[in-house]
Amino acid sequence: MPSNKVRTRFAPSPTGYMHVGNLRTALYTYLMAKHEDGTFILRIEDTDQGRYVEGAVDVIYNTLRETGLLWDEGPDIGGPVGPYVQSERMSMFKQYAEQLVAEGKAYYCFCTEERLEALHAEQRAHGEMTHYDGCCRDLPREEVEKRLAAGEPYVIRQKIPREGVTGFDDMVYGHIEVNNSEMDDQILIKTDGMPTYNFANVVDDHPMGITHVIRGSEYLSSTPKYNLLYQAFGWNIPNYIHCPPVMKDAQNKLSKRNGDASYQDLVAKGYLTEAILNYICLLGWSPKGEYAEQEIFSLADLVKIWTPDGISKSPAIFDPLKLRAINAEYIRRLPPEEFLAKAEPWIDSAVHTPINKKLLCANLQPRCEVLGEIPEQLDFFDAMPEYDVSLYANKKQKTTPESAKEALEALLPVLSDEALDFNDRDTVFDACKAKAEELGKKNGWLLYPLGIALSGKQRTPGGGTDLACMMGRETTLERVKAAIEKLNG
C-alpha cells in the first residue's frame, strides 16, 4: 500500500485486561500517527488461541474508547486493508511462507519435539545457548516431497544466512548490528499451520502499509530476523521505535501475569482516565524545549508536542506516588459539577442517608487524591461511631471535654433556631461565630467540639459547620444532644 503518510498500528492480543505497558504502546502509537496527521490502525492478534480470553476484545475496544485513542481503521469499522483480525488472514501466512521455501529462503523442518528437547538438553549440558542445529536445512528436495506426501508433521523455518551481519536503525536505540551466526533459524509456520508471532507481524504490517512499528525493547533482539524477512520478500523496512520496559522496581518488570496494575485496576481504584493516560505517557518519555518542566498534558496537548526523540533508553519505574500526585492535580482542576458527578458513585456506596452532596464535594475536592479513598472518609454519616471523650481535648483549640460540653450547650439553641438556614453554610457559620464572640471565645473553641460531636473523628471532610450543613438540622441536633449526654458521663 504505497503512501507517504505515516501509518501506525496497535496490535494487541486478547489475553485479558489492558496492562499499563500495553496502554503506553497504544498511546505512543496513536501519538506518532496523529502528530504527523497520519493513520492509527487497530489490529487484533488472536492467533495464540491458548492464551485467548473470552471478552478480552471488548476490553481492548472499551479501553481505547475511554482513553480517547480512537482508531481510523480496525475490525469494527473496516478500512482499505482488512481484515483487521489476524485469524481472518490465515490463508496469507502459509502462502507467503511457501513462497520463501520455493525461493530457498525458508525450509520444511520435520524434527520432532523429542529430538529438539534432546538437542537442547545436550546444548545446555555443554553450557551453550539452545538453538536449532539446521538438521533439515539442506534436505534433498526429493526427500522433502516424499515426507510431505507421507503426511509427516513439519514446521517452516526461516533460512538465516550463516555469514555476515544484519543491521537496523532504531529511532530510540540508534544503529544496531547482529552477527547472522548468532541468530537461530526461527519458525515461521507451526505444526498446526498457525503462523508464529514474528512472522505474522511482518506479513500483516507490509500489506497494511505500516510505516512506523512501535513496541517494547524486548523485541530488539528479534528485529534483525524481521529485517531479513522484509529483505527476503523485497519489501520496504518500516521505521522502528523500541520503548524501554515499564518496571515495578529496579529488578522487576510490571507484568499482568504477576497481578500488577492494569488500566482497569487503576480506574476501579478511582484514578481518572485522563490522569492515567498523562502519567503513562511520562513513563519513559519526556517533553522537550518550553514544555520540559511541564507535567500535566491533555491528549490534545500530547498530539501537538509528542515526538519519539523524547523516549528514553532507560527503563521507566512505575511510581504510584507520582501517579497519585498527577491524579490529585486533575481532580483539583475539575469543574465542581464534574467532580460531583465523578465522586457521587463513591459517596453513594458509603452514605445511605440524605446529605448535602454539593457541600460535601466542595470540601472533598481540594483534599482528594484518589476517588476510591472517598468512602473511608464518610463512614460516620450513616451512624455515629463509638469514640472516647478524650477526642475533645485539643491544645491548639484550647479545648477539653469539660469545655466541649460548655461549647455544645451554648451551640444547641443557636442550631435549634428554626430561622437558621442549614442550606446556607455561611449563614450557619456566622451564627456560630457570633455565639463565640458573645462568649469571648475563638471560633475553634466552639466549632472543634461540634465537629467531634457530629463525626466522632478528628479528621473529617469539612469543619463543624460544614458537617452540620451536610447532615441537616435534625441529625445535627440529635448528635449534639447525644454528645452532651456522653460528656455528662
What kind of feature is each model-predicted range?
Residues 20, 266-274, 313-319, 352-360, ...:
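Structural motif
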Residues 83-87, 110, 189-190, 208-219, ...:
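Conserved phosphate-binding loops in nucleotide/dinucleotide-binding enzymes
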Residues 102, 107-242, 248-254, 262:
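Active-site cores that bind ATP or allylic diphosphates and position pyrophosphate for catalysis
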Residues 29, 60, 100, 104, ...:
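Residue-level signal for inorganic ion chemistry
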Residues 34-46, 199-212, 233-247, 461-466, ...:
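Glycine-rich phosphate/pyrophosphate-binding loops
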Residues 336-439:
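Small-residue-rich helix-loop
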Residues 2-125, 222-235, 275:
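N-terminal Rossmann-like or analogous alpha/beta NTP/dinucleotide-binding catalytic cores
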